[in-house]
Amino acid sequence: MKIHTLFAAIFLLFIVTACYEDKGNYEYREMNDIEITVEMEDKHPSYALGDVVTCTPKLTFALGQESTNLDYEWSFAGKKISHTRNLEWVADTVANDKALQLAVLDKNTGVTYFGHIYITVSSKYAADGWVVLSEKDGNSTLAFIRHVSGFNTPSVAVRDVYQMINGHPMGTGPMSVYPHWTSSWGGEEEASWLWVAQKGGQGALDVSGSTYQQKATLSQIFLKQTYPEGFVPAAVMDLQILSLAIGEDGTIYTRVKETNKLFNTGRFIDRPLTSDAKGEVKVDGSMIAYTRFDYQAGLLCYDKNSAQYLHIGDYVDYDSGETRVGKALPLKVDEGDYKEGDAKLNDMRNHKVHFVGASSKGTDFTMSYMAVIENQTTGKFYLQKFTVEAYDGKMSAVPTKFESQEEMVGLGNVINGSAKNSFALCNYQEQAPYMFISKDNMLYLYYMSNSTLYPCAQFESNITSMNVNIYYNRCLMVGLENGDVVILKGIRSADGEPNLDRYVINGGNTIQVTDAENDFVLFHEKDFGRVVQVFYRWNMSWNEYFY
């Protein structure tokens, strides 16, 4: 009986639903969806507080015709900043690598569409740009020139920023300046700090890159809170865990930091770094191929005391936290790599190394290097090319591939023993196959593609320092003895821009850098004092990627 009743109920329910008439009024239409593209000239835009951030988004409509009833809302780091389609915003919020987002509301449908790009806004000084160390009126001075991309003119040039912030001169006898960082994960500060080496005053100083306040003095970080006897600081280079204090005579003293999350922990020992098992042969640190790469686990050094290239280890195991640092390791080269007459990397006797630099990021954490060497018997100059694997913390010699040695014809007229020479190697050799070499006030360009040396530019004073910026290697900064600082463009150019290939290499012309306007001069200012060192400071990351 219950079964019959159940069937009857189901049958009645079917009849009722079958007789129901849906009188709803539905309108079906195709959605005009919006695809939003938010792009800027640089892939990793970086701004300082007070900068004007502009962006013209690209809106693509699914039906090919733009909707008219739209609302716009821009936000950065979760803060609403504008309600216009095209953004023009004075940056007022400090944030690192946060989304600059555009939300577009179609009021006809109630649907909101989104597009974004990640940007960084930092303090006035915690930004990408050039650092200039110079000597003016007998004092060491630091200047900061903010310059994010290689196409635009630098937006801020702050002179003698150390004295302006700290209220007193930095010191005397400037020697060098190098940036250093803490870990990207929970480090003391995102911005890099600067080790400034100088002979007088307080000696070598550590300065915050975001405020330019003095943070430490090198002498106080030695075990005895004073320099070892005879030590005169020429450079301080901080790696992940290992720190190098390099003397004017090339002697290296080391410190092993307790963590890479803080800028200064641990103390320098008074025993010099050595390369032999007995600890008797001191490593000479006068020529180090300085790079900003933690994955290489150290730095390459040419040690003239042992006449060989060495890898100074700085290995950190990020899983276990284990460190293996502070050893000067030889390179392991297959003898079959060499041709007859090639100088061997672990036996450079009878050769003088004038320069060694990192040329590009290789594959599988290898690093490519180029060195300018001179055969002291024949007087001929050569370009050495070799690739070094990353140090894994266990190897006793670092595997290395010797690539080639080619004669640099004509370089003997540039490096003659009496002229002042500076060097700058473009990191991104695939697109900028150049090495810049100066002789007094003349700048030369060595073109890797045809192994030829070209006169490139003439200045009104001797060149004292050069450096190439990292953003696509677009610019070369040149510091002069008379206090001028010049940024040359044209290394890698946008369409229609001046180009070194066309003007110098193909045209046979030499750029004349004077006070007059010049298509190749992006920036030219005077009165910085005698320039000691210039370099491009990439603000917020250890790893300097070669774009």
Which sequence ranges carry the predicted segments?
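Preference for solvent-exposed, low-hydrophobicity sequence contexts
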Residues: G187-G417, F423, K489, N499, ...
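Short loop/turn segments that connect beta-strands within beta-propeller blades
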Residues: V148-S149, E258, T387-E389, M448-S451, ...
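Beta-propeller domains
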Residues: S134-W181, W185-Q220
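Acidic/polar, low-complexity intrinsically disordered N-terminal segments immediately downstream
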Residues: Y20-M164, N473, E481-Y547
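Short loop/turn segments immediately following the C-termini of beta-strands
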Residues: T60-A62, E135-D137, H147, A197-G201, ...
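Loop/turn-rich, solvent-exposed surfaces of beta-rich toroidal or solenoidal domains
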Residues: I415-V486
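Positively charged n-region of N-terminal signal peptides that target proteins for export
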Residues: M1-I10
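C-terminal motif of bacterial Sec signal peptides marking the signal peptidase cleavage site
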Residues: I15-A18
